[in-house]
């Protein structure tokens, strides 16, 4: 599904995207099942996160991809799934065409390629209990697209308003207190079983906007108000990423936490 989250307006000058990425294993988990795609890079399959934020500053001309993956599965299957998706994103982004029409079809095709890569990784591991979420931004010189599969999230902060752009793919049936709802979609589902439908939202790229991609290790620890407050108090992307991760750890750090914070100038 494709939705517009702001109206049309021409962008007369080129904008610059600034971004920082940080990942932490958390205080409870024995391994980091998160991964990311950031400035052409991802983490190794076996990792404990990043000690310091990765940083990107780039004039927006052709498309820029940023993505967070949250793997799931027993043993080391979560790490394998997230790494397989991040690696495939590297391959997909190395061949991004300069002009894309229509963008929705391109974004959907990338998601399908990521899904197939995780399905193949599961086959090699002889398991069906492997998958990963995806939350991504695709930024062009005029537009920004938020794309997700699963419950990792994408947000925009504009003029003090914190808006969720992603859509959680979770079971709506009520569960016992303390239990998280099951995912209805994720990367790693065999197309013969279910054809995934990525949620895609489109908006105009405007100077002053801030964006956040994150795994549920952040939003399970912090409220939207707390996240907004941290982002408003930390206008620079690197300190903001560090402050968000530290706040999640201070609240208990029960899960891996990965964030990508972006600013548009």
Predicted regions and their residues:
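PP2C/PPM-type serine/threonine phosphatase catalytic domain
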Residues: 1-265
């Amino acid at each position: 599904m494709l939705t517009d989250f702001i109206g049309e307006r021409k962008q007369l000058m080129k904008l610059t995207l600034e971004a920082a990425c940080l990942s932490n294993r958390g205080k409870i988990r024995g391994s980091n099942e998160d991964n990311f795609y950031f400035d052409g890079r991802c983490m190794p399959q076996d990792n404990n996160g990043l000690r310091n934020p990765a940083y990107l500053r780039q004039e927006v001309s052709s498309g820029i991809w940023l993505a967070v993956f949250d793997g799931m599965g027993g043993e080391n299957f979560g790490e394998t799934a997230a790494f397989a998706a991040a690696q495939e994103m590297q391959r997909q982004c190395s061949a991004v065409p300069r002009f894309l029409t229509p963008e929705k079809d391109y974004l959907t095709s990338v998601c399908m390629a990521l899904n197939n890569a995780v399905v193949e990784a599961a086959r090699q591991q002889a398991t069906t209990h492997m998958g990963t979420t995806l939350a991504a931004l695709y930024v062009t010189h005029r537009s920004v697209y938020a794309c997700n599969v699963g419950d990792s999230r994408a947000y925009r902060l504009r003029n003090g308003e914190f808006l969720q752009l992603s859509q959680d793919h979770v079971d709506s049936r009520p569960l016992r207190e303390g239990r998280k709802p099951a995912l209805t979609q994720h990367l790693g589902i065999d197309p013969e079983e279910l054809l995934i439908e990525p949620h895609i939202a489109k908006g105009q790229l405007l100077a002053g906007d801030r964006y956040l991609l994150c795994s549920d290790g952040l939003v399970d620890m912090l409220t939207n108000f707390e996240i907004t407050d941290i982002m408003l108090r930390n206008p620079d992307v690197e300190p903001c990423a560090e402050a968000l991760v530290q706040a999640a750890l201070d609240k208990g750090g029960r899960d891996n936490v990965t964030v990508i914070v972006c600013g548009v100038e």
